């Protein structure tokens, strides 16, 4: 058995296959909190960055000094990466599919005793074994200009054109419409959903202003009400007013007024039978995941299936 540092993984979590033993001199097993993290990718770096972020948030107090190396596809580019790693040794995460390119990086790290981890190997090996198909090993393949790419662009253009109540008379052309009071994360949530391929519109609820009839009559889109804890919403609005050098005690930010506004919004959602998502303690990604699930059920009732693009 390779000399794994069990303190790194625990008895129930052996290191991934192919992961080199961590040298005890690297300091990771001695409570090290700050370290150099090199992220190496043969494409845009989104995958390796997302996986690294998802892992790092599980460790409190860890502050990596991140070095990004994108579009690494040739020997010369790998040599520059290796030089950078030599200058700031630490931990290396990579997503490289070309065997020759990754071989250079792995050999250099092995020679210098630097831990070097391929994040996609377990997934690719599992898929290959299950499907009985060899991996094609084409870098950046997920970024080809295919139908998914153009669908994403189309969704982004639609969403930008239908932000904050614009062109709400065309709401029935949307996949998803978000409705909520001011500062309830409608626009950023719509943009995230658009990046997943959904045509989105959003409409702000303003006290004393009735809903447009086109929105109430819309049958095709999933209409979702967004709500937020009044205290949190009041604080956010006050911060917004401070940023704009405006009076913080305006009705817009007063707690009692905000509370009444939120209650009125909930009554509207209930009357129209719209599902409600409370975004108080949810990130944009978490709220969007809930909305996507609602949309999938919305389509199932019509005998359809949602096609969700990867993030």
Swiss-Prot record:
Sample GO molecular function, one term: phosphotransferase activity, phosphate group as acceptor
Keyword Nucleotide-binding in record: yes
Annotated catalysed reactions: N(tele)-phospho-L-histidyl/L-threonyl-[pyruvate, phosphate dikinase] + ADP = N(tele)-phospho-L-histidyl/O-phospho-L-threonyl-[pyruvate, phosphate dikinase] + AMP + H(+); N(tele)-phospho-L-histidyl/O-phospho-L-threonyl-[pyruvate, phosphate dikinase] + phosphate + H(+) = N(tele)-phospho-L-histidyl/L-threonyl-[pyruvate, phosphate dikinase] + diphosphate
Enzyme kind, highest EC tier: transferase
Record EC number: 2.7.11.32, 2.7.4.27
Binding-site residues, ADP: 180-187
InterPro entries linked: Kinase-pyrophosphorylase, PPDK_reg
Nucleotide-binding in keyword set: yes
UniProt KW keywords: Kinase, Nucleotide-binding, Serine/threonine-protein kinase, Transferase
PANTHER family named among the record's database cross-references: PYRUVATE, PHOSPHATE DIKINASE REGULATORY PROTEIN 1, CHLOROPLASTIC
Similarity comment text for this entry: Belongs to the pyruvate, phosphate/water dikinase regulatory protein family. PDRP subfamily.
Functional summary from the UniProt entry: Bifunctional serine/threonine kinase and phosphorylase involved in the regulation of the pyruvate, phosphate dikinase (PPDK) by catalyzing its phosphorylation/dephosphorylation.
Protein name: Putative pyruvate, phosphate dikinase regulatory protein
Species assigned in the record: Paramagnetospirillum magneticum (strain ATCC 700264 / AMB-1)
């Amino acid at each position: 058995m390779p000399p794994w540092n069990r303190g790194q993984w625990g008895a129930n979590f052996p290191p991934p296959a192919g992961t080199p033993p961590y040298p005890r001199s690297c300091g990771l097993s001695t409570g090290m909190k700050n370290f150099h993290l090199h992220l190496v990718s043969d494409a845009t770096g989104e995958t390796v960055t997302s996986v690294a972020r998802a892992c790092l948030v599980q460790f409190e107090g860890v502050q990596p000094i991140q070095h990004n190396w994108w579009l690494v596809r040739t020997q010369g580019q790998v040599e520059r990466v290796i030089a950078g790693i030599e200058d700031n040794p630490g931990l290396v995460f990579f997503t490289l599919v070309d065997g020759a390119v990754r071989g250079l990086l792995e050999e250099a790290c092995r020679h210098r005793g630097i831990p070097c981890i391929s994040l996609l190997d377990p997934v690719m090996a599992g898929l290959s074994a299950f499907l009985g198909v060899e991996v094609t090993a084409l870098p950046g393949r997920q970024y080809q200009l295919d139908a998914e790419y153009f669908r994403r662009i189309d969704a982004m253009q639609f969403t930008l054109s239908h932000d904050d109540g614009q062109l709400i008379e065309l709401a029935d052309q949307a996949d998803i419409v978000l409705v909520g009071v001011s500062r309830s994360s409608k626009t950023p949530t719509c943009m995230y959903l658009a990046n997943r391929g959904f045509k989105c519109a959003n409409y702000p609820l303003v006290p004393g202003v009735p809903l447009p009839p086109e929105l109430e009559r819309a049958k095709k889109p999933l209409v979702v009400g967004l709500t937020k804890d009044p205290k949190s919403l009041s604080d956010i609005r006050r911060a917004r007013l401070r940023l704009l050098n405006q009076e913080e005690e305006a009705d817009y930010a007063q707690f009692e007024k905000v509370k009444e506004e939120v209650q009125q919004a909930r009554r509207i959602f209930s009357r129209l039978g719209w599902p409600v998502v409370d975004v108080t303690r949810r990130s944009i990604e978490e709220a969007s995941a809930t909305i996507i699930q609602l949309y999938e059920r919305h389509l199932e009732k019509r005998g359809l299936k949602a096609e969700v693009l990867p993030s």
